[in-house]
Regions:
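Gram-negative outer-membrane beta-barrel transporters
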Residues: 517, 637-646, 665-786, 856-858
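Periplasmic-side early beta-strands and strand-to-turn transitions of outer-membrane beta-barrels
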Residues: 238, 247, 263-347, 354-356, ...
Length: 859
């Protein structure tokens, strides 16, 4: 009886607890939609710090039973969207809540850019540009700038083993010659990378990458005649977080990246990012059937942000890169060599060697080369940047950027690129750069907004690049009998050394004036002053075209250096007009001018005049008409432009001939016309994103006499036939003429290109998403190199289409993907050219199909 009574009592107590709980508990309910009002099926809604939560149903509706004892926070998340958190008190109404999630990556008109050194939406910027944000970079699985340029019309990057080259609107930047500046400006957090050796193309912890097409001479200044590439890193934040990526693929491919963000104090935050990249490569040296290390990179970045006062933000960063590689070479497509000997000139070297001593020097096809010695390359790069942003008042900010960068590249190489002991070489290139910029920026919300600033740049560079021609070189290249070559030229050396400073200062101003709600005018100007001081000497072999510098009246090398200083200045204005047809569609027009400073030939030189006479600055005027806009729902964005660029004194680096190597000269005039169009489109409730583009260029030398006089007779040059035999003989008088490329296409660019990326995402449940992406890009045929003694068709790269992609599963904290590059296994040429010493043609073929697995983690 007692037991029954206790049982009844317990039941009563449980019933009272249940009734009390139901009485005091509350139902949290509401809906989760995107910014267009579409329900987000499976969105995750949880009460932070508890196990209470729910997933949104087909209508985006959710309910949660919960007893609020104090303030509480609701977290709402969905794959591909920004998580939101809202805190409520226990007395707040918590039924019929409405949560609107924003896409994780800004899209279309919303994209924020720094193209004009202030934050604004991409639609408001009256120039032709593309911005790729952090989320898109991650979605693509992009690990290099080259990956990103595949979806940017009229911008191309060719990332070979040790460096990245760029071509924007048909203009290729720079040369290996330290006396020549680059044509495009590559910037990292507002700091110019003054030489290719300062650039790390591996993508690590980038917030966005902006591609500005056309000259940017007003705000970015010198050496941005083709455009600018603006890389912006992720800044430290007060939220502790970390992220890691591991990629494993064929051919010994292993890439690892990671970043950690830490809140040091309430007002000081720190961030560290690191990466490593190892790749055995896809090219085989048939000499010993080996694969040399194609990539072996280690890099990182430390950053600290201080917000000690509401008015002042300080960002300090240190980044570094270490490369330690084995040199590779290219497949020889045409063994015919250039020689002063009629016995060897125009004959294939492989056949010559079989005839001489039965030596086989051929490789095994396009993915192979044949070197008897393996060189190495080491690069140590580091830099530090200090960025300060001080709010003077509500309407004016003072911004300053200071930086220092240092790069040392040391390599040894098999210069002849064959299995023969013909020539070896070394390269020791040191670069040190310091920059400072200060600018005042007004509030952009006034009818007249403006910015103005000053800029200082100092670059020191030193290059020592000896080559060691062996007796076999003199035998083949000049026909000297082998026993004489061994007696006269054993231990021969050609050793150029160039060093010096480039100092540049500039002042700039730009202003926007809002004439009406629809019309805005922008005008700006910059004054630049460049001073180059170079010292040069070369221990040469005058009888073979490599002169001694400095030398006496007999051509003998003397002590000291050739010393030269030159100063150039330029005024580069710009004018823009922007007209809003609708709130989401703008027309724009641009007239802008670019300037690239002059310089000196400080590579191997064949005459005293070529080093003593600097090449001139180049100037470009850009005319541009474009449109930017999208639909009201912001699921479509289109950016298009027509352009015409007129060049004066375009600088061209080109191969001359066997004993002259590469030389820089000025084309008289060149004209580049074209168009570019890119779009972004979202379909099927944002589950499918399409990004594509089309570009076309027509680039012609209107007038180009390269000014190259080699000092000896070439086929086609006029001469006095003294003995009447109908052919030129030694010691007969001749007219040494330069080469005329007028009417020729500018090399290294494709006339036409297009790209398309399709990204499809489908929720598996409230926490997991299936992702698949395909990317395809097409490049038209192009001429690799201008040459004075080779048929242009031999140096023409065929058109190619590449298909890359990945698929996998991702959550808020991890992801697993299978990925592939060159899925169709297309055979294509990255670059080719004439061997600088023997004249045969080498080709570097692109990566064949590469498959791998990628894993990501976020904490």
């Amino acid at each position: 009886m007692v037991i029954i009574q206790k049982s009844s009592f317990n039941k009563v107590i449980l019933l009272l607890i249940f009734i009390t709980t139901q009485f005091f508990s509350q139902e949290i309910s509401g809906t989760v939609n995107d910014s267009q009002g579409n329900p987000l099926i499976g969105a995750n809604v949880i009460i932070e710090g508890t196990n209470n939560g729910a997933a949104a149903d087909l209508n985006g509706f959710f309910t949660i039973e919960f007893i609020p004892l104090d303030d509480f926070t609701i977290s709402v998340s969905y794959i591909g969207f920004k998580t939101i958190k809202v805190t409520y008190s226990k007395n707040d109404p918590i039924t019929n809540l409405q949560f609107t999630l924003i896409q994780g990556k800004l899209f279309g008109n919303e994209v924020i850019v720094l193209a004009r050194k202030r934050e604004e939406t991409i639609k408001e910027v009256p120039i032709s540009m593309v911005s790729i944000g952090k989320e898109t970079i991650e979605d693509m699985g992009a690990t290099s700038i080259e990956d990103l340029t595949a979806i940017v019309p009229n911008v191309f990057a060719y990332d070979d083993q040790t460096a990245t080259g760029f071509n924007i609107r048909g203009i290729t930047g720079g040369a290996r010659n330290p006396g020549m500046a680059t044509a495009e400006g590559v910037y990292l957090d507002g700091v110019i990378m003054g030489r290719p050796n300062f650039i790390s193309s591996d993508i690590v912890d980038l917030q966005s990458v902006e591609f500005l097409r056309g000259p940017q001479g007003t705000l970015f200044g010198r050496n941005t005649v083709s455009g600018a590439i603006n890389m912006i890193t992720v800044k430290p934040s007060p939220v502790n977080s970390s992220a890691f990526l591991i990629e494993k693929g064929d051919f010994g491919y292993l890439k690892m990246k990671g970043s950690v963000n830490y809140r040091i104090t309430d007002k000081i935050y720190g961030r560290f990012s690191g990466y490593s990249f190892d790749h055995d490569g896809y090219l085989t040296n048939t000499f010993d059937n080996s694969r040399e290390k194609y990539k072996n990179n280690l890099g990182g970045r430390f950053a600290i942000r201080s917000v000690s006062t509401p008015k002042l933000t300080l960002d300090i960063s240190y980044d570094f890169l270490q490369e330690d590689l084995k040199d590779i070479s290219g497949h020889v497509s045409d063994w015919r060599i250039s020689s002063r000997s009629s016995t060897f000139d125009g004959k294939p070297l492989d056949s010559i060697m079989i005839a001489i001593d039965s030596t086989v020097i051929n490789d095994d096809g396009i993915y192979s080369y044949n070197l008897d010695s393996t060189g190495s390359t080491k690069r140590d790069l580091w830099g530090v940047t200090l960025n300060a942003n001080y709010k003077l008042n509500e309407n004016l900010n003072l911004i300053s950027v200071f930086s220092y960068r240092s790069s040392l590249v040391v390599w040894s190489n098999d210069e002849d690129h064959t299995a023969l002991d013909i020539m070896t070489g070394k390269w020791d290139n040191l670069g040190e750069q310091s920059t400072f910029e200060m600018r005042l920026v007004s509030d952009p919300n006034f009818q007249l907004s403006w910015l103005t600033g000053v800029f200082y740049y100092n670059l020191y560079e030193r290059l020592i690049a000896p080559v060691y021609p062996k007796p076999l070189f003199f035998h083949i290249a000049a026909g000297i009998p082998m026993f004489l070559a061994e007696a006269q030229f054993a231990g021969a050396t050609v050793e150029p050394e160039g060093k010096g400073n480039t100092v540049s200062v500039g002042a700039f101003v730009s202003a926007d004036y809002t004439v009406s709600e629809k019309l805005t005018l922008t005008a700006g100007a910059r004054y630049s002053l460049d001073r180059k001081h170079f010292k040069y000497r070369q221990d040469g072999i005058p009888s073979f075209g490599y002169v001694n510098v400095p030398s006496d009246s007999n051509g003998h090398l003397i002590s000291g250096y050739f010393d030269s200083t030159k100063t150039w200045s330029a005024f580069t204005p710009s004018f823009n007009i922007k007209y809003s047809i609708t709130p989401s569609i703008n027309l724009f027009g641009t007239i802008s001018k670019g300037y690239k400073s002059g310089g000196f030939n400080t590579d191997y030189v064949s005459s005293y005049e070529s080093v003593a006479t600097p090449f001139k600055p180049e100037y470009i005027t850009n005319y541009e008409l474009g449109i930017k806009g999208g639909n009201q729902s912001n699921t479509l964005f289109i950016n298009g432009a027509l352009f015409r660029m007129e060049y004066i004194d375009m600088q061209v680096s080109q191969f001359q001939d066997l004993f002259e190597g590469y030389s820089i000269s000025n084309a008289g005039k060149a004209t580049i016309t074209g168009l570019e169009l890119d779009f972004s489109l979202r379909l099927f409730n944002n589950s499918l994103t399409l990004i594509g583009g089309f570009g076309r260029n027509e680039a012609i030398f209107n007038e180009f006499h390269d000014g190259y006089f080699n000092g000896y007779w070439n086929e086609g040059e006029e001469y006095t036939d003294a003995n009447g035999n109908g052919e030129y003989d030694d010691d007969e008088e001749f007219i040494d003429m330069d080469n005329d490329y007028s009417g020729e296409h500018i090399s290294t660019f494709p006339k036409q290109s297009w790209s398309l990326m399709a990204d499809f995402r489908m929720p598996i449940n409230s926490k997991m998403m299936f992702v698949t992406q395909l990317r395809s890009d097409y490049i038209d045929e192009k001429l690799s190199q201008l040459s004075t003694d080779k048929d242009a068709n031999l140096l023409r790269d065929d058109a190619r289409t590449l298909v890359n992609g990945h698929f996998g599963i991702e959550t808020e904290s991890w992801g697993v993907f299978a990925w592939g590059e060159n899925l169709m296994d297309t055979e294509y040429i990255i670059k080719q050219g004439v061997n600088g010493y023997l004249g045969f043609i080498e080709q570097l073929w692109g990566q064949p199909r590469l498959l791998g697995i990628r894993t990501t983690f976020k904490f």
